[in-house]
Structure formats: structure tokens, C-alpha cells
Design a protein with these regions (language model features):
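Conserved beta-strand signature within the Rossmann-like core of class I S-adenosyl-L-methionine
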Residues: 240-248
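Active-site flanking residues adjacent to catalytic metal/cofactor-binding acidic residues
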Residues: 113-115, 138, 165, 216-218, ...
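Canonical radical SAM enzyme core domain
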Residues: 141-147, 224, 248-252
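General small-molecule cofactor/ligand-binding pocket signal
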Residues: 161-163, 270
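Short internal loop-to-helix segment that lines adenine-nucleotide cofactor pockets
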Residues: 90-113, 157, 161, 173-175, ...
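Short, conserved loop/helix-junction motifs that constitute active-site signature segments
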Residues: 126-130, 233-241
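S-adenosyl-L-methionine
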Residues: 1-141, 146-151, 155, 206-208, ...
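Conserved acidic residues
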Residues: 166-169, 200
Length: 287
């Protein structure tokens, strides 16, 4: 494992229980923060390395977290290293292309799966787009489940099911590792004993009575082949996602196992964003 990875110590994360006693809106940005956020959204400060440093500066100007709205959804940001929260705070178009790809063509009762859901960047907009469907939001980090539970409640969203599990090709227990001390870059370590439960995607979906998926997003820091490939190759045809957004390991290249499975099942690469690839199932060909 790369030397920038280390064991995730959950005890070092901020105690969110005390802040969650305050309803959403209690921690709205102050006047100075609002001005700085507006400047950031309109300048280069919303990009790359500028964004993380500028976001940290903004959040340091008040005590406690920040409550913001993104795509009509409520998010409480925790001033803890989390690149997703930096994007939510400063970039009004953050991951919009990726989210819109999944939503386009969905019905009011379409189901979605979000593997590596973090604070709900994808899960919440997907749930709003299909209010009569279900969103299965899976994250191995128990803190992310708590934070997404708070966010969805604040957004008055009732069709998200949050699941605190890691996804792999088998079931067991492991630990979590973190890269660059960023809570958004966390992966499962199956070889180190710990309290993190992992299971297969097919088992998770069966437990939650999901028999059809319109869109699936997966971002689990290198575990994509183990989590997704066995599911795709063994799931009934009806359960195959119509659309998939998957994190790229490097520019213009996808995980080898997933690429083979996509080809076998007639998924077409239809686009790429900065961080992800977009695949659509060709339903007109035999699978």
C-alpha cells in the first residue's frame, strides 16, 4: 500500500453528536464567510489546491460546522479534511455532470445505488430526482452514515437507506485506511483485523429487496474490481444497472476487471469527467 495510506482512527474524528443536537440552519455561514464563499464560487479559488486551502480558511472563521444548501439538499460541513465538503462549499457545479448523467432518463420510481456515499453528494440529489424510488447509500465509515443520516433528515428526504458496510467479493471483518488524512479518501483493508464489516453487493441488495437499479455510482478507492465485478457477472439481468458512474484510477483509464465485465455485458463508455467514467448498458444487445 502506498506510504500515504494509514489506518483510519475514528476516535480522532470530530464528535458530531453534540453538534447534531442543533437543527440544520443553526450553523449558517456568518457575514464574512458568506462574502468569502461568494468570491470563491466566482474565481479560481474554487479549483484544485486553491479550493482546499480556501475552504479551510473559511471554515476556520467560526466555531463548529457550517450548514449549506447544494442542489436543493442540506449539508452540514464539519471542517474536517474532506475534499467532497470543499467542493460542496465552493463549486456550484461540483460533480454536476456525473450526477446529471445518472439522473437523466430516470423515472419517479427509479432505484439508485451509491457505493462510497460519504456525506451524500450523489445520494441526496438522486433521491430528490426519483422520490418514489429508493437510494441504497453504502459507506464503510460509520461517521459518514451518521452525517448522511443528519443531512437527509434535514433535507426532508425519506427514500435513502444508509448502510454502514464495506463492499467486497466476500463477507468478513477488516479495517479502514485513509490517504492524505482526507476523510473522503478511505478504503477497506481486508488483511488487517478490525471492526469494519464487509459484504457482497448482491447480499446487500437482496437484504434490502432491491430487484432493479437505474443508476449506480461507485468510488471506493481501488476496491472497485472486488466489489463490482462479481456482482455484475452473477446478478440477474434485471438487476444490472442501466447506468454506472465509476471512479477512474488514472486519467482516461478504468479498473481492468470492471472494463472486462463492462465489455462482456455490453456496457458502453459514453463519457468521462475529471474523476469518473460514465457507462450505459446497451439494452438492444444480448447479455
Amino acid at each position: 500500500m502506498n506510504s500515504t495510506w494509514s489506518k483510519l482512527e475514528l476516535s480522532k474524528s470530530k464528535n458530531i453528536s453534540q453538534h447534531n443536537d442543533y437543527s440544520f440552519g443553526y450553523f449558517i455561514p456568518n457575514k464574512l464567510q458568506r462574502v468569502m464563499i461568494l468570491i470563491g464560487k466566482k474565481t479560481i479559488l474554487k479549483r484544485g489546491l486553491f479550493r482546499s486551502k480556501y475552504a479551510k480558511l473559511i471554515m476556520s472563521l467560526s466555531k463548529g460546522p457550517l450548514d449549506i444548501i447544494f442542489r436543493k439538499c442540506s449539508f452540514r460541513l464539519w471542517n474536517e479534511s474532506n475534499l467532497i465538503e470543499y467542493g460542496l462549499l465552493l463549486d456550484p457545479n461540483y460533480n454536476n455532470e456525473d450526477i446529471d448523467f445518472l439522473i437523466h432518463g430516470a423515472k419517479k420510481n427509479s432505484n439508485f445505488v451509491d457505493i462510497g456515499s460519504n456525506v451524500g453528494l450523489y445520494s441526496q440529489p438522486l433521491a430528490l430526482a426519483s422520490p418514489n424510488g429508493r437510494v441504497i447509500s453504502i459507506d464503510a465509515n460509520p461517521l459518514m452514515k451518521l452525517r448522511l443520516d443528519f443531512n437527509k433528515k434535514s433535507s426532508n428526504i425519506s427514500n435513502i437507506k444508509t448502510i454502514n458496510l464495506a463492499v467486497s467479493d466476500t463477507s468478513g471483518k477488516g479495517s479502514l485506511i485513509i490517504r492524505k488524512n482526507d476523510i473522503a479518501i478511505v478504503a477497506l483493508d481486508e488483511n488487517t483485523s478490525g471492526d469494519i464489516n464487509f459484504s457482497t453487493l448482491i447480499e446487500i441488495l437482496e437484504t434490502n429487496n432491491i430487484d432493479e437499479i437505474y443508476g449506480l455510482k461507485i468510488d471506493i478507492e481501488g476496491h472497485e474490481d472486488k466489489a463490482l465485478v462479481p456482482f455484475l457477472l452473477n446478478a440477474p439481468k434485471k438487476l444490472l444497472p442501466k447506468k454506472i458512474v465509476i471512479e477512474k484510477p488514472i486519467k482516461n483509464q478504468d479498473y481492468a476487471g470492471c472494463v472486462k465485465a463492462f465489455k462482456k455485458l455490453n456496457y458502453n463508455l459514453v463519457g468521462r469527467s475529471k474523476n469518473n467514467s460514465f457507462y450505459a448498458l446497451n439494452v438492444h444487445e444480448k447479455t
